[in-house]
Amino acid sequence: EVAYYTQLGANIHRGVYELSEKASVAYDRVREGVARFIGAPRDSHVIFTHGTTESVNAVAYGWGLKHLKPGDEVVISEIEHHANFVPWQMMCERTGATLRFIPTDPSDGTLVLDNLQQIITEKVRLVAVTAMSNVTGYMPPVARITARAREVGAVSLVDAAQFASHSRIDVTKLGADFLVFSGHKMCGPSGVGVLWGRTAVLEDMDPFFFGGDMIVKVRKSGTTFKDLPERLEAGTPNIAGVLGLGAAIDYLESIGMDAVHRHEQRLLAHALERAAECDDVTVYGPQDADVCGGVFSFNLGEVHPHDTGAILDSEGIAVRTGFHCAQPLMQVFGITGTTRASFYLYNTIDDIDRLFSALERVRKVFA
């Protein structure tokens, strides 16, 4: 971002002067890098947005509003972030479609897939599911869900906002028709996201946002739009953010996503071992680092998560507390919130031990 503002500072795809052309080349190279990062065959199918929330809404308004009608069904899970929950709830209310849910096992937060064929039927037009819970770190068998969607002719959307920074993405293996994620969860800047889609579904989307750079010709009688990806990228984009996302991807690829995932598994396994030694620590999610990313969600006895978080903060430990934009999952667990520690490539085993040492102070304060 700094390099853009100090060395370029020009808009893209509009100017014939050198700075604009350099900015355009840099911007388009990031599109190529994103396609490589997710295993996509065509970079023209990578659409830049302002984040995962905008990406999901783009599909909801650009595809859902066009195709959903009374009698149709949309299937999501109970573990979704609100950004992949509320848009489909609102779209079903608007179109008359019915919203159905893949249920959750309240004992460990995993999806119950025994009756998947009865949930995803021929009435279903779209299935939207997360690749990794932002509350528990649980990574559901997405490919199994998208395969069932494909069997009945439904379109699938995979929310990879949490997943993209923790594990290797291969859109072919995931079986997704749409894939969405954000830059700020993967060492990149805020305000930039990605929407990827297969040829058929992207070309079938109506633009949901209109303005400059997406058009071929504007007349008083009507407008002609460009081909992908420009057709779905109206206006001046977050150029600096996109370049920052590209730098983040280069950095992660230099480390290797498999190495990142293995490191997180070691950290999570250690946290689960430490938690098992504590009678007053309740962990939410599978107690298995092999099916989770670097998310450790817990409560300490009857202490409110906000109180736990405040004391941990005084000890120099940053955690998030509350319902984590996932109230339906909290309702499944029968709680109002958790304390969530997020582990990443820069954390160490010592950081985990510091967390559990700091919990001793929480116990003393609320003894």
Could you say what each language-model-derived stretch is?
Residues 1-367:
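Pyridoxal 5′-phosphate
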